[in-house]
Amino acid sequence: MKKHRKLLTFGVVICLVAGLVAGIFYYKQAEEERRLSLIYIPKVVDGTNDFWTSLIQGAEMAAKEYNADIRVWAPEEENDVEGQNKLIERAIEEKPDAILISPSSFTESDQLLKKAKEEGIHIAFIDSYTQEEVQDLTVATDNLEA
């Protein structure tokens, strides 16, 4: 049952990230012909954790399918909110078309994500979200139903 749920989550993530990439792609394509630039900031990159590995692979597959560039940056520890915020700041400086993020904190990243949005960067929440609704898209399971 758990494996089935992981595969289902993986499939849903791929589809939704692909939809986000496609939507941004077609919007930006009208402006000019170029590859989209995406930065995905998960809570952690851990090769022993199937969940995070699946999410990252799904995002990379969707980016490849839609001819987008994706970079994955993550803090060393899953609960390293400060490290994740530094990566958000770095991403804002890079000015990608979108930041895909699995926020480690419900409140601690709000101001930075608002700043990114004000800079014209699209925001997609993957697996978790923040108190402020700054996102263009949220991809998550209902943990109470699951």
Set out the residue ranges of the language-model regions.
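Short beta-strand segments enriched in small/hydrophobic residues
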Residues: 26-55, 65, 72, 136-137
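Periplasmic-binding protein-like
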Residues: 92-103, 122-126
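Flexible loop/hinge segments that line or gate small-molecule binding clefts
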Residues: 106-145
